[in-house]
Amino acid sequence: MEFHIQKNINSKEPVLINFKTNDCNPCQMMSPTLQQVKNAIGNRVLVYNLDINKAPNLAEQCQISALPMMVLFFEGQVVWQTKAVLSKEEIIKNVLEHTQ
């Protein structure tokens, strides 16, 4: 999984990753919201809800310092990130704003 995601990050397609753990309550709150984002704009951006324990190298590479943490990649570069718990609308707005 980690290799697959890394490959997508380096492509031209936008990639949104929500870094989480299963025992993080705010992370769990974000899961349904992230699914709504995926349903709304999944044809324009790859969306992953990723447990850092299953992708420790990627989490380290992205310098994940708090959870949940969302990181948006576009053309291989980090173009936006947040540690905030956001609404579907706020996430979509930021994704579209940073990938146009």
Model-identified regions with their sequence ranges:
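A short beta-strand-turn-helix
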Residues: 1-14
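Hydrophobic beta-strand anchors of alpha/beta hydrolase catalytic cores
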Residues: 16-17, 47, 70
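Typically the conserved alpha-helix immediately C-terminal to a functionally engaged Cys/Sec
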Residues: 28-40
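Structural microenvironment flanking redox-active thiols in thiol-disulfide oxidoreductases
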Residues: 52-59
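Structural micro-motif
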Residues: 62-71
